[in-house]
Amino acid sequence: MKTPSQPRAIYYIVAIQIWEYFSFYGMRALLILYLTHQLGFDDNHAISLFSAYASLVYVTPILGGWLADRLLGNRTAVIAGALLMTLGHVVLGIDTNSTFSLYLALAIIICGYGLFKSNISCLLGELYDENDHRRDGGFSLLYAAGNIGSIAAPIACGLAAQWYGWHVGFALAGGGMFIGLLIFLSGHRHFQSTRSMDKKALTSVKFALPVWSWLVVMLCLAPVFFTLLLENDWSGYLLAIVCLIAAQIIARMMIKFPEHRRALWQIVLLMFVGTLFWVLAQQGGSTISLFIDRFVNRQAFNIEVPTALFQSVNAIAVMLAGVVLAWLASPESRGNSTLRVWLKFAFGLLLMACGFMLLAFDARHAAADGQASMGVMISGLALMGFAELFIDPVAIAQITRLKMSGVLTGIYMLATGAVANWLAGVVAQQTTESQISGMAIAAYQRFFSQMGEWTLACVAIIVVLAFATRFLFSTPTNMIQESND
């Protein structure tokens, strides 16, 4: 019997997903280098801005999802988000010497990312009935598409920026998003079954004006608001407010469902360890990128490899790790039992620690010989990428076993995305030249060593905890969703 093919609309979603990842990760690979090289920001300022931007892009999808659910529909939200991200890159590329253009461009991209990121997966979900067996394959295709974009982006945008200038690198990132949008719009006839804008809600009157007019005002003011946050380094205050709200939600869950309190505490612990992991992993876009730019010998075949290209190593490692992880989870490889959740977490952190130890070794080599080894750096980054698939997929798999998985997944993403990126900036400032004047290489060596040592200590704690409490993640059956939910 022939297996039904995927809906035609999925290929347009996959196309825009590839180009969105290309746009986002292309610009991200250039950002810290652009701030320090072109605009002359010191390390402290550059890392603070980079971490603020990286954290805020994980806050706005909450609002973007709400707007799509209440007013816009997923398809319209995706289109609006893609347009805003394209506009943001255009603003960034017009004047690469203006700090105001920088802040405004990042703010526009943050708003666009919020509308796009939270709704592209929801739009894909609309293509399937609840029990459609093609659903898992569709989401796997979407995930693979993202990896293609994130691998290609640092290579293409990095080479463009090095050969033709920053404005070309940013233009390429924005152009990719625009190409993805055009492909997506060309398939509009395949999205007839998806939810459209709620015209009745948009034309209803609230506070003396139609709702659509308030929406326009909000879309115009939001970039101004985020520009102020970035320019004045106020993002931490917004993040603190959002985290307090998230903590209150979990506390109310514990009060409302006392029988679930133990499982909720376990999820909170997962969030804590996941956040720790991503504080370390997000050093790749700031501290590690600056180290590569300044101290790694990037000559290969008489060509200087652009620093941005190293951002592709992580994505390549994630794809390769997916194959290995699938093998580990297969029935043939389980042995006596499936690897326990906390041992998987410990293994992921162990790989991260080994990666940082390799970086510390490379920094020591640079201190002695003047330059670090590109091969050692790539090996360290690959280990860090490999570690990723032992953290997030494991945590999400456990969270989604619970009845209140939607809210908890959102809070987990907030913790490991927004909070981790902001804290990563705080941690990274240990290496800033303004704090350790004239001893940059020593600062990097000490930083990488400390990160590796602290992570190894966390691994030891988690392993002891896992063996000391045999049923650490045994969950009451009434917490777990029924199989037919």
From Swiss-Prot:
Gene3D superfamilies: MFS general substrate transporter like domains
Substitution effect: E388A: Lack of activity
Cytoplasmic side: 1-12, 68-70, 126-140, 186-208, 256-262, 329-340, 397-406, 468-485
Domain of life: Bacteria
UniProt GO MF annotations: dipeptide transmembrane transporter activity; peptide:proton symporter activity; proton transmembrane transporter activity; tripeptide transmembrane transporter activity
Membrane topology term: Multi-pass membrane protein
Name of this chain's protein: Dipeptide and tripeptide permease C
Organism field: Escherichia coli (strain K12)
Taxonomic path: Bacteria, Pseudomonadati, Pseudomonadota, Gammaproteobacteria, Enterobacterales
